Amino acid sequence: NRVYLINSTRDIAKLGITAENNPLAHKDLTAFFTETGDGAELYLLVMAQATLLSQMCSIEDGSPLKKLITYAKGRIRLVGFNRLPPAEYSADTTETGIDKDVVTAATAAQSVGDSFAKKVMPFRCLVPAAGWGGKTDKLYKPREGSTNRVGFVMACDDQVNKTAAVGQMLGRAAKYPVNYSLARVKSGVIATEGWLTNGETPEECDAMLDLLDEAGYIIYRSFPKKNGYYPNDDPMGAPLSDDYSNLNYGRVVDKAMIIAYTTFVEEIQDDIETDDDGNIPQEMCSYYEGRINNAVASAMQGEISNFTSYVDPAQNVLSTRLMT
């Protein structure tokens, strides 16, 4: 229940995490830093093995997710959840094809993410498509969901335990600019061998890959005459019509939001002139807009194609004590 800040594979060893005493944490942490290299900032919170994903993502005060985000004071932009359940655990897959608790967790994580975004602490999540038995009938389709802050990882980098490649996908996302898709081929091979969370290779599940892709799962794909696997895409649990249907779309907006906030917050409690109705002069609004636009353009070169801020002059800042 303690949060640790890890910056390298050396820190994994310092914490005493090994493939023997904590195979899931060791696997995901190693995969993350294999992608990013040493120096990346990763916050780790390890829970008891019996802890459900839905409990990790709970909207209740003091939940692991809320604890993690609060501890990092808004520095976390990507969150990955994974779980190696105890031997006696039996996943309920009757209605969803994957562990129903994963779907419940995604809904909770979405609510928590929305609440923190209002505090200018936005983040996106990846959850494991755990418990999948290899069948597609009744399979939950993230693309028909309403969790545009949460993606479902069905790619697996552990054939024995069938755990999702969450750390690996987080590392790929963290390594590159926010506008890059996980599926960008120029980013290189993400795995030389891999499976899906039913323990079978993509080749063994070839007849289902298109369906899984269309359903909105993050899986492995390969290309003729190219070795290894690449992510198929970075879908979130939302339809393609959603503005944040993919991870990179949401990450771009999150970064712009934070830059706009950190620029605008410098103006708090500064002295400004207002008209008789308490409204801000248009020239001051234009000044604020210019500062924000310039900050975003400077910090997000190549990551965003267009950005325009707007400060409404028709707002009584004297009575509301707010400026938007």
Language model: regions and residue ranges:
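Short, hydrophobic/π-rich interface segment
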Residues: 282-305
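Small-residue-rich
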Residues: 1-133
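A short glycine-rich, hydrophobically flanked beta-strand micro-motif that places a catalytic Asp/Glu
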Residues: 305-312
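Long, contiguous, structured domain-core segments that constitute the functional module of a protein
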Residues: 170-284
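Conserved, well-structured core segments that form the ligand-binding/active-site neighborhood
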Residues: 76-208
